[in-house]
């Protein structure tokens, strides 16, 4: 048995043979969803959809209307009561709905039309892929790799994949609300690997959150964390292809 003074935190105990063996080639890639391969439509587009559906579109005509709503959203999101509501919000649709309503009730434009706003948030076309999402998924597929999504999300994100005809490129979706767990809970990563029939040491986790997505490292996965991305620009996903060669 190999002993060490400083143990590396691990959710998966490795045998001595595994510790001594070289890392296997990457056979599967696990992706976070939000802000990794998909992003929500921009704020102005979402507000216009809410305004159209609720009869409040005229309220957005002012020169600084969107900027003021954005300011109120940021201010409200820092309120202690709103912060508390966000804790565990992706564990169930009900908790997420309450978290959003508790936030939006502090915003003049959204107060009273929160249900409409939520419907527009969760619409199939309210989330879209980055320009390099599909090419990267297809390139991984062409190399014979299995693909999963592991996401903290409070509704079925498969509707967004299907809307953009990308569902056929993903083998498994492990979504927090369906398991009653949020990342970095090890069980989510282990479940995805099991779904793909892949040893965690032969899997790569790609995300944008060092804590939540980086938690995959404690499960034996290699992990790649993307920097904060700009909207409507390549996400930098092509770099992943170099990691799986």
Where do the language-model regions lie?
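Asp-based, Mg2+/Mn2+-dependent phosphohydrolase catalytic module
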Residues: 1-31, 40, 109-112, 134, ...
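N-terminal helical cap/lid subdomain that shapes the substrate entry/recognition surface
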Residues: 2-134, 143
